[in-house]
Every structure is written in C-alpha cells, then in structure tokens.
Regions:
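Secreted/periplasmic carbohydrate-active enzymes, especially glycoside hydrolases
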Residues: 1-343, 347-351, 396, 411-412, ...
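Substrate-binding/catalytic cleft of secreted carbohydrate-active enzymes
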Residues: 204-206, 318-320, 328-595, 604-605
Length: 608
C-alpha cells in the first residue's frame, strides 16, 4: 500500500501540477448523478473556484444553505514523459465526504472534511491528452462523523444541516488539489525525534519506503551539510545546533534519498526545526525553558471564501498575532491547511493541534442549551452509533498525527472539543484515543481535550487521561453575565479551587474564554455586547488566571469574528473575536497587546 500524507513537493524525482482554479459545479439534490453519468458529463454546471467554500458565493439562500450531494469537474493534462511513473491525485480536503472519478472511473472514496487523501490513477489516465476529473461531495451531518450533528428535511423536501457545533457548516473543495508524478519506489513517510546535548543535538529518524533500496538522510543549514546518516532508521548528530524557538524559528533542510547504485531513485525534501517540548513540574518546557502560552482559539473562516484556503488571509492573521504578542493558537476545531503549519514553523508559533471531534453532545435546541446542561445531552457515548463514531475518530486522529508529526510548531494534540464527558461511557471512549495518540507520535507530545462548562473537577470522567487540563470557561458571559461580575468572579475562583485538588502536578490552560462584542458598540456604563463590558470581563478573567500558579496558558476565544448557523443568539455569526472578520482590531485587541507584550515568556516560572 502506497498511502502517504507527505506534503507535495517538487524535487529531482517528483513532478507537480496544481489543479486549483475555476472548476465546473452542480448541485445534485436527488443524488442521481452517479447513475446518470455525471462523472463523464456534468450537466447544467456553473463555474466554481477551487479552493473555496461554495456557500457564500451565492446570492440565494437555498444555494447557500444547500445540504446533500454536489459535484465538481475539471480536466487535467498528463505529459507523455510521465509514462512509467505513478500518477497520483492529491486533495488537501473535501468537506465532508468525497468520491473521486477519473475518466468516469471511480478511483477514491474519503470521509472527513479536514485532512488530505490521494488516489493513484496510473492505469486510468490517458497520456499526452486531457483527462476528466470529477468529484462527488456531500456535506450532510450525522452522529457518526467528525464533526457531529444531524441532517433535517424541511417541509419543501430540502435538506438542511443541523450541527451540534457553533460554527458554520461550510462545504466544498477547501484546500489545494495536486496532480503528482512520483517514482514507483519512493519515500512514503518519515518521522523525527530530538535530543539536546552539551555539544548540539541528536535527531533520531525513521523513514518508510515502498521498496528495497538503501536510504540516505542529510541535514543542511543553507547550502552547508551539517549531518548525514544512512538506513531507514538512524541518528543525525548536529554540532552547535541552532534551536527552533518562539518567535525565533530556525529551520534546517532535510533531504531523504533512495539510491539504486549511483542513481537516485527518489528524493524528498522538507524543512524541520530542532526543539524539544515537555511538561515537567507543572510547566511547559520548550528546549528546557518554561514557556507561558498566550494566544487564540481560531477558525479557518473569512468573508466570501468561507473555509477555503486563502494565503493573503493567512499572512494577515500571522502579522496580527505577532503584533498583539501571541505565541500560540489551537486549531479549533479541526486540523487546518498544511500551509498554515508551515507558516507557524517559519514564524515561531506554537500549535495545539485539534482533531475535528466537536459536537459530541446532543441538544434539542442548540449548542448553548447543551453547554448549559439544558439539552438532551446525557449518554452521548452510550449510543448504538458510538462504535462507528469511535472508529471514525481513530481514523481522523491517525491521519492528523501522521500528517503533522514533523512540524516543530505542533506541541500538543487536542483529541476532543467540549465533549459531554460526565456519563458512564466516557472513560471507555476516551482511553483508546489517548493510548492511540501516544502510540502514534514518535515525539510523545502532551495530549489534552477541552472541558466544557458543565464538566467540573468532581464530575468530569475524562480529565484523568489528559497530560494537561484545558478549560473552556465563560464566567461573566454565559454564566452570571452582566452587572453581577463580582458573583462571576467568586464562582470562577470556587471552581478553580476545585481544579487545584485534582491536577496532581499537571498544568492547566484556558482554551476558551471571552464575550461577544459587536464592533463599534460602546456604552457607559457598560452593558453586555459593548466594548467596555468586553474589557471589564477580560480584566476580571485575567486577574483570576494570575491568581493561580498552575494556570500556564490563556487562549482567548476567538481570534476573529466567524460565521455560525443563524439564530437568535448569533448576530450574523459569533462576535467574540478580538479582531473583526475583516481582520481589524476591536478595542480588546489593545488590552491584549498591552498584556501579552509585557508578560515574560516564562511568566509564572517555578522558582527553584
């Protein structure tokens, strides 16, 4: 099996053609396209950009809210000189499930809207001519998929998504599509693990290939080779190694080659950063030194393109995070585009990488009812659908770790977001996931999950599995909001005192906290939704954080305003952003800039 999640790179032995651009597109509400031959000829199609969500490109609501099957179509040319190579199609992501056809022949199926997949089409393509590529996608939700939800049928027969999560169910081909020509024998995967020494660093590596020929591994600093080894497993010894650090990223070039005699059979290049990350004595240690996490929960979300990868937006986001003094973000609530991790590697940002396990609580009304315990949420992990959900969860977790394990920016894995975790089935569901994450990751990064408001120190059955505790807390917003901030602060302290008793030396971070603020809304004295109230809430919350030595990080919710399903609790989306959806600062951004640019990186370091 030649499955590989390596990022596509052109080398002396590999060829790439990007297939992004304007494709053809058509809805298939009756799911008749396969039988009707749409894989060869897509009828009544319109133009559609790739990558992008299709939703916000339309001006009619039925198209924007469409739920069901939909098709994409394009064509690609295969050069004659590619004959004798393996021809592979690679999709960065299709939300949420996809069937891929080439020249009318089905070549791949995939479920999961946030991770890549590929299809080998060597025996199907026609050389030196154009080939038809068709993708049948579907964006319906269910309780066996990640993220979780349901799909309802309206009175007029149309389907509509009913998510258990609080972000819009954007759909489409969201990330780049590549056509690749790869050698028959090739590098499929590699992994690294780092040790710091008195004279530099050692890099233990493992390389996976699909053939018998020998492997060499070299490390370059610019044009200078600084280490080399041979074999599919080995160690690179780097003298006077330059370490990767927060806002001081240093990257080396890794070159992996397969040799047959004097010929190079395959060559794969990547960039890596030498660093260690661990938890010791209740602190996060980067290269042995304490680091206090400050930053954001985010979303891949922007005007018009929805969740589609947009590199100018990515660049702007990193510039804003540098301006405000952040050093970390969580990929809430799904793995992001690979290009975002590459930029984090280059800019020196830390990432808590989250699998799309969100919506694991059922509510008869909406996410808020479930979060407050008012929904029909008990026993989410005791359903008939749970075994299938767990199987899909393990598959997504495996792909996320396989894809992202070599990024120096990735420091931890988040295995679930706000699951209902007070019922009897919690431990049986959690245990194999945490064991799988530890087994798959050669660097043994810390594992966590985010704890929702109704899961308390004495009721949460999942927290014992976490290497550090991640709390989502909204004292002063969803709980005791408004004029009673003093009561909110007292209740917050009461819960924190409870967590102090169960941490057993583990650090605790906040992965969500915040209030909605409609940009430009001011009120004196303050009221909820105003900029003044948002700042008062943040000052109170930060005072609570600073009171507890075991609090080792603060990731505010959210980096920017983002789109959600419409409803009476959302004013055209979630407005908890510190920046607007257009990436302009709200008043609270200046509060964070003042705090985060003055906090030392080792804030709350333990005195020896």
């Amino acid at each position: 099996m030649n499955r590989s999640l390596l990022y596509p790179r052109a080398t002396t032995t590999r060829r790439l053609i990007g297939l992004d651009g304007m494709w053809r597109f058509s809805f298939d509400p009756e799911s008749k396209g396969v039988e009707a031959g749409w894989a060869l000829d897509l009828p009544s199609s319109i133009s559609m950009p790739v990558p992008a969500s299709f939703c916000d490109l339309f001006t009619d609501k039925a198209s924007r809210e469409y739920c069901g099957d939909f098709w994409y179509e394009t064509s690609f040319f295969v050069p004659a000189e590619w004959s004798g190579w393996d021809i592979v199609l690679r999709f960065g992501s299709v939300t949420h499930r996809a069937r891929v056809f080439v020249n009318g022949v089905e070549v791949a199926q995939h479920e999961g809207g946030f991770l890549p997949f590929d299809a080998t089409v060597t025996n199907i393509v026609r050389y030196n001519q154009f080939n038809k590529l068709s993708v049948l996608a579907n964006n319906e939700l269910s309780e066996t998929m990640l993220p979780a939800g349901t799909t309802r049928t309206l009175a007029d027969g149309r389907k509509i998504a009913a998510p258990y999560f609080d972000f819009y169910n954007y759909a489409g081909i969201h990330r780049p599509v590549w056509l690749m020509a790869l050698p028959k024998e090739r590098v499929l995967d590699y992994s690294t693990r780092y040790r710091l020494t008195e004279t530099g660093a050692e890099i233990d590596y493992t390389v996976s290939t699909n053939g018998p020929h020998p492997v060499t591994v070299e490390l370059y600093d610019g044009t200078t080779r600084v280490a080399e080894s041979s074999g599919t497993t080995g160690t690179l010894v780097v003298k006077n190694a330059k370490l990767w650090n927060v806002h001081a990223a240093y990257l080396y070039d890794l070159v992996i080659r397969i040799h047959e005699g004097s010929a190079v059979v395959d060559e794969y290049l990547d960039r890596i950063g030498i660093r260690t990350f661990e938890i010791r004595h209740g602190r996060f240690l980067l290269n042995g030194s304490p680091v206090y996490l400050r930053g954001f929960g985010r979303h891949e979300d922007a005007d018009i393109r929805g969740r589609g990868l947009d590199l100018p937006t990515v660049k702007r986001d990193f510039e804003l995070m540098k301006w405000i003094g952040a050093n970390c973000f969580r990929t809430s609530h799904y793995p992001y585009a690979e290009e975002i991790y590459q930029m984090a590697d280059e800019e020196g940002f830390l990432i808590i990488d989250e699998v799309p396990a969100v919506g694991f609580m059922q509510s008869t009304a909406n996410f808020l009812a479930a979060n407050q315990g008012n929904g029909r949420q008990q026993g989410f992990f005791e359903k008939e659908t749970t075994p299938t959900l767990l199987k899909n969860h393990k598959a997504a977790l495996t792909d996320m770790i396989d894809r992202d394990k070599n990024h120096p920016s990735v420091i931890a894995w988040s295995l679930l977001d706000e699951p209902q975790c007070t019922s009897a089935g919690t431990e049986e569901y959690f245990k194999p996931l945490f064991e799988l994450a530890r087994r798959l990751d050669p660097q043994k990064r810390p594992r966590t999950y985010t704890v929702l408001m109704t899961s308390l120190p004495d009721t949460s059955k999942g927290q014992r599995f976490a290497d550090f505790v991640s709390l989502n807390r909204y004292y002063g917003w969803y709980v005791l909001g408004g004029a009673g901030l003093a009561d909110a602060e007292a209740a917050f302290h009461h819960e924190m005192d409870g967590w102090a008793k169960v941490l057993h030396g583990r650090p605790l971070i906040f992965t969500e906290y915040g209030t909605d603020n409609l940009s430009g809304a001011h009120k004196l004295p303050s009221v909820m939704w105003s900029a003044e109230y948002q700042n008062e809430y943040l000052e109170m919350t930060h005072a609570v954080f600073d009171h507890y030595d075991f609090v080792q990080g603060e990731l505010v919710w959210n980096f920017a305003d983002f789109q959600t399903t419409e409803g009476i609790l959302r004013v055209d989306g979630n407005k908890k952003g510190i920046f607007t959806r257009q990436r302009q600062p709200k008043d609270a951004a200046y509060l964070f800039r003042k705090r985060w640019t003055t906090l030392p990186i080792d804030f709350k370091k333990r005195k020896k």
